[in-house]
Amino acid sequence: MNPTLIKKLQDFFQKNPITIGEPSTADELLLVEQTMQLKLDETHRYLLLHYGGVVIGDIRIYGLKNTELIGDETFVELTNDFREQMSIEAQQYVISVDDMGNPILVDTATREVILYNHDIGAYEKLFNSLEELILSKLNK
């Protein structure tokens, strides 16, 4: 992972400890990958292993053990819930939800962060990667 991003995350979370959840173990993440039948995004994996579910700027990035600012619902539960409601590709999973209730997903094949807009029934690319999304929030 990008060393600049790692440093920025360390600085951000040192100044904003309330935005940190509880880190997951590598074994927990391996079990999730086996259950979901996909490989987690590298940046999301890093966040989960070091910080858990977090809030960075105005975005909630769900984990298995979230900051209390997010609540208890995991990214696995979100993904399963949205899979019941709409068509999510096998290589995609939900990492967040916007203020309108639209899921924000990572596509593990392309690394892109995409939003599914319920109102128009279409996907919209938000960022080329989760890393790019996080940097955009940290640089504000």
Question: Whereabouts are the PLM-identified features?
Answer:
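A surface-exposed partner-binding patch
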Residues: 1-104, 138-140
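Short acidic-glycine loop/turn motifs at beta-strand connectors
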Residues: 107-110
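Short, compact, well-ordered microdomains
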Residues: 113-115
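Short, solvent-exposed aromatic-acidic interface loops
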Residues: 118-121
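Compact, glycine/acidic-enriched structural inserts
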Residues: 123, 127-139
